[in-house]
């Protein structure tokens, strides 16, 4: 969040961070309603499909408050801009990574998304991963399924992921998680069911828990979003709209993938930077 604060300060904007706190029962809808009631000049929202959130976005816009979604988009809402990664870009990148983890023992792949679409099979992400896997495997024998968890809250997501591992016959060989919350739930389920190393998790985002899981081999690889760009572009999108009444509808940010080796290298570099702050 430091990047967003710096970018905001450069634009003479006061940025207030509001988010889920384990010490409270507030969810994102609550924070949205608080921001609307406080008559914020603009709102930057990490959309997660929570019930009522899309209508809250529309309410904010109707009240003259511009809303910018980040990481996940509310495509049917009246939000002004989305800062993140396009489904096409994600599909291409994930397809390449998933294909690398396909081997002779791979029989089932499950893709978990939170996307505002009616048919998962029409998702660009699902389509591109499927195509990449079929090309890598050279056959149609691998079962690839997609599941949309958009309408689930945190508790429901945990239940849905846990249910996947309780059905032993249907446990996938590769589980693809397309958002932070689902990745965190999958990480915990893998530990609870003692399946580390048996199910390959392709995750999303780089929280401390997720990075630690990659280091330990619980998660095979995770998608790293350029948070510097994310912070800069989201503040830029809001301030541009406030100042000029217009902004780009989409700001694209870069991604890469971190496996165990990459995470360990990142840790070493962080320690070096702390020892030599002036270099």
Q: Residue locations for each model-derived region?
A:
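Short, solvent-exposed amphipathic alpha-helices that sit
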Residues: 1-11, 90-94, 120-143, 156, ...
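Alpha-helical recognition/docking segments in bacterial nutrient-uptake
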Residues: 1-89, 93
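Short beta-strand elements in bilobed, periplasmic/extracellular small-molecule ligand-binding domains
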Residues: 8-24, 108-111, 133-155
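Second-shell loop/turn segments in exported
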Residues: 21, 79-85, 115-120, 145-151, ...
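Hydrophobic alpha-helical
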Residues: 32-33, 37, 42-62, 67, ...
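Conserved acidic residues
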Residues: 41, 80, 107, 173-174, ...
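Hydrophobic alpha-helical segments within soluble ligand-binding/sensing domains
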Residues: 83-109, 155-160, 206-210, 225-243
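Hinge/cleft segment of the Venus flytrap/periplasmic-binding protein
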Residues: 226-279
């Amino acid at each position: 969040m430091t990047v967003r604060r710096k970018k905001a300060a450069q634009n003479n904007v006061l940025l207030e961070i509001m988010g889920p706190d384990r010490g409270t029962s507030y969810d994102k809808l609550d924070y949205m309603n608080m921001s609307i009631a406080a008559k914020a000049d603009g709102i930057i929202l990490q959309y997660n499909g929570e019930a009522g959130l899309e209508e809250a976005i529309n309410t904010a816009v109707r009240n003259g408050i511009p809303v910018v979604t980040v990481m996940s988009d509310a495509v049917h809402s009246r939000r002004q801009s989305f800062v993140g990664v396009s489904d096409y870009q994600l599909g291409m990148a994930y397809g390449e990574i998933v294909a690398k983890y396909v081997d002779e023992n791979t029989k089932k792949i499950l893709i978990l998304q939170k996307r505002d679409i009616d048919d998962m099979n029409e998702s660009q992400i699902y389509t591109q991963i499927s195509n990449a896997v079929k090309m890598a495997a050279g056959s149609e024998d691998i079962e690839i399924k997609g599941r949309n968890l958009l309408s689930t809250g945190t508790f429901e997501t945990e239940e849905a992921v846990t249910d996947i591992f309780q059905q032993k016959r249907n446990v996938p060989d590769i589980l693809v998680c397309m958002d932070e919350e689902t990745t965190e739930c999958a990480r915990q389920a893998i530990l609870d069911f003692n399946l580390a190393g048996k199910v390959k998790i392709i995750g999303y985002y780089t929280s401390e828990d997720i990075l630690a899981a990659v280091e330990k081999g619980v998660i095979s690889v995770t998608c790293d979003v350029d948070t510097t760009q994310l912070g800069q572009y989201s503040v830029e999108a809001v301030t541009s709209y406030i100042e000029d009444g217009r902004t780009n509808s989409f700001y694209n940010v870069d991604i890469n993938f971190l496996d165990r080796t990459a995470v360990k290298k990142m840790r070493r570099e962080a320690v070096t930077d702390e020892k030599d702050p002036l270099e």
